[in-house]
Structure formats: structure tokens, C-alpha cells
Amino acid sequence: LARVQSSPTFPRLGILGKGSDFTFLSMELLGPSLSTILKLIPGGKFSFSTAIRASYHILKCIEALHIFGYIHRDLKPGNILTREGTEYPLCLIDFGLSRMYINPTTGKHLPNRDKVGFRGTRAYASINAHNLRDLSRRDDLISWFYIIYEFIIEPLPWRKVENKVQILTKKENFDVASKVSPVAPELFEIWRSINSLKFED
């Protein structure tokens, strides 16, 4: 978090201190998460215009993190908090699963590892995450798409499924075109573009 303080899309750090048997960190007081807000809205859904604006600002948060050389690997509405009174109304939090994707010495993309452990939250994780593949920027964008799908279209088809194999199967059979084209055809083009990305893109 200290490395991304120059960007307003992340919480501002306050005081870091140490007591005799504890360490503490204070940070900017932020508003509720998008997940919390959705639960408070009748029908559990944003208006179309609010969903579009939120999608844009989430993407700006992701872009900022990627510019700093990190991928998040756990994007979900619960990790996006609101902030009042600024031109940056959303803030990205929870970097416990984040990882550098750029070699700080060479400036080049880190190589694709053969197999890794699962990272993320199953509802919003990419198929690559389910298949224990190394994640990159494209996987953050897939998680972003799942988020905005819920904002604009409807709950994800696997939202209430708990079995990880069944979740993966539903994702593999996810007919995005038939779901989004009648409402927001541009979303399908975004989905196609994201899925055309390679590991280092």
C-alpha cells in the first residue's frame, strides 16, 4: 500500500506506530463497500447510469494498480470502498493476494509459472484461477467483468453455487452473448477483447 500512495485510487496511509507489544497503522476513513451498498438497495441492483459510472471508476483503480506493476488477484465488490467528496469516488483495498507482475530489475513481465495455488474469491475468479494457472492483468479484467455483469445485467449464474467444480463448469458454459447483447451489446465486445488477451498483455 505504501508503494501506491501517489495514486488517489487507494486509501491514504496515516500513522504507523509501535507499542511495547503491538504495531498499529492508521489510514483514511472510507465509506461502505459496493457489496454493502448493493445489499441496502431495494432489488439489490444499481441503476444503469450508476453501474456504468462505478464500472469506469473500478477500471481506473485496476489500471492504477497495474501501472505500479501489481495485479490484485481478488477483485470483488467487497474490496471496493466508497469515498466522499473527491473526483475519485471509489477506492481499491485488500492487497493480501496481490503480486508484482513486473520484474523490478529488468522491467519485463515475469514468466508464466506452470502451476500455482488458487487465488481469489470463487465467484469472481477467472477460469485460469480455477485451473491453478498463473494469473496476470487479464485475470483482473475478467474479475472486473464479472463485477460489472452483476451491476448491469443480473447476479452471476454461479453466485449461489458452493461446489468449486460446479462453479467452474458454469463459468465454462457461460453464454455471455445471449445475456448481455439485449441490454448492453458493448459489453459483449468488451468480454471478447478481454478473452483475447494473452498472459503478458
Regions found by a protein language model. Give the residues of each.
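Structural motif at the C-terminus of the N-lobe alphaC helix and the adjacent alphaC-beta4 loop
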Residues: 1-8
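Short beta-strand micro-motifs within the conserved protein kinase catalytic domain, predominantly
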Residues: 12-23
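Structural motif in protein kinase domains
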Residues: 30-40
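Activation segment signature within eukaryotic-like protein kinase domains
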Residues: 54-55
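Catalytic-loop of the protein kinase fold
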Residues: 66-84
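Activation segment/activation loop of eukaryotic-type protein kinase catalytic domains
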Residues: 83-119
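Protein kinase subdomain VIII
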Residues: 106-107, 118-133
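Conserved C-lobe activation region of Hanks-type protein kinase-like domains
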Residues: 127-184
